[in-house]
Structures are given as structure tokens and as C-alpha cells.
Amino acid sequence: MIKASDIYNRAKQLAESTNETEQRECIKTLYYAVLHKIQEVCDSKELPRTRAANLGSHESMIERINVQNLPSEKQIVSYAKKMKKKRVDADYILSLNINNKDVQYQISWAEKCWYLLDRQ
């Protein structure tokens, strides 16, 4: 069985590429690594799996970490939502030029999420 860290490590490998297809894949993979890291932390804390009627499945997974409304939890949610937007751009807007700058933003947000999640 793989872990979120395995997905994260694969994304970091993709980040070394200058190929736009691999940069898009990196952006997507970093998002999913963080999403699974959130899920791992929430599961380890035995947080309930509830899905709000007005949220999609990814939004519900992201919001699950925000149980006490602490600043660190809010930051994780904020970064993860930024990552989701970047992932949607990379996956669906093929006319958009994706480059190393976009990859670096996604890496930065992922690292911040990872740091905060490791301290939950």
C-alpha cells in the first residue's frame, strides 16, 4: 500500500522536468499528495467523515482538517484550496501555459501544508 509521502515523492521527481506535460502532472500529483496527507492525519485523529451538502468530495476532505478552526487548520485549508485551483488549471485548461513558476507555487503550498499537517 502506498502513502501520501510516496505520491509526494513522485511529484518532486516530476518537478525536475521542463516538459509542460510533466509539469502539469506534477501540479496534479502534488495536490493529490496533500489531499491524501490530510486524509491520513484526519484518520489518525479519528475525525468524522462527514460531507456537507454544499461541498464536493474534495472540498469535504479538505475541510475535514478544520475541526477546531485553529489558525494552522485554516492555513492548511487555504493552501489546499489554492492547490486545487492550480490543479484544475493544469488538468483542464490546456490553452493555459504551465511552466516552472506554476510548479514552484504548487511545491511551496504543498510544503507548507505538509509542515503544518506534520504538527497536527
Language-model region placement:
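Terminal alpha-helical segments
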Residues: M1-Q120
